């Protein structure tokens, strides 16, 4: 037994005497014997067994039945019936049952006097690996205990919903890319730019410069010429910019 004992678990030693099913008649005889002996506090199992005189009933059966009878009638002045005594016994046995944490998943409250809104905070979750609760169940339990009016999953996005949204966005982005393949764009530039580009493209334009050491007067004239040349170049650039024409041709298949 030492290998199967668990720390913190109270061992329950069952009696070797076989169980016996109490009938209404046997319980009535038991109650009459208890009353004849002066009540439940004065009656002893041995005297009760002698007064009952029922075959197949041992003193161990009388002891256990008397203990349950005392616990059931402690809060009542009237004799307890067999039905109430049986239900009370079942409740006591169910409280002592050990629930295997590997096979079942239960929520057991540690304090019964706490408010209903705070029970979930002090709830002890004992769950096996094969029955792990989902995030939806945890949020549903949390919302229901606090009486929220909003749906429990109003702000929760599951994995399936996130996957669906991502696929929809990918489809929406891919459609414009497919449609743009049928779009034809034509850029036409003014005559001044065409002439300049054509001369550079065929390599026919050449630039020859002769550099000489300028004198003082020539340097002054050269700086003035550079100033007027820069102003003229800026004005010419503005004129070229205004001469830029952009023609956009879109095929009819893309518009449809």
Curated annotation (Swiss-Prot):
Residues covered by the HTH myb-type domain: 14-74
Tissues where the protein occurs: Highly expressed in the pulvinus and stem nodes. Expressed in the plumule of germinating seeds, coleoptile, leaves, internodes, leave sheaths, spikes and roots.
Disruption phenotype annotation: Increased sensitivity to cadmium stress and increased accumulation of hydrogen peroxide in leaves upon cadmium treatment.
Keywords of this entry: DNA-binding, Nucleus, Stress response, Transcription, Transcription regulation
SUPFAM superfamilies: Homeodomain-like
Induction description: Induced by cadmium in roots.
Listed InterPro entries: Homeodomain-like_sf, Myb_dom, Myb_dom_plants, PHR1-like, SANT/Myb
Major site of localization recorded for this protein: nucleus
Regions recorded as binding DNA: 45-70
A Pfam family the protein falls into: Myb_DNA-binding
Gene Ontology cellular-component annotations: nucleus
Compartments where found: Nucleus
Gene Ontology molecular function, alphabetical: DNA binding; DNA-binding transcription factor activity
Function: Probable transcription factor involved in the regulation of plant height by elongating internode cell length. Involved in the positive regulation of grain yield. May be involved in the regulation of genes related to cell elongation and cell wall synthesis, which are associated with plant height and yield phenotypes. Plays a role in tolerance to cadmium stress.
Something else known: Plants overexpressing MPH1 exhibit increased plant height due to increased length of internodes. Plants overexpressing MPH1 exhibit increased grain yield. Plant silencing MPH1 exhibit decreased plant height due to decreased length of internodes. Plants silencing MPH1 exhibit decreased grain yield.
The name this protein goes by in its record: Myb family transcription factor MPH1
Gene: MPH1
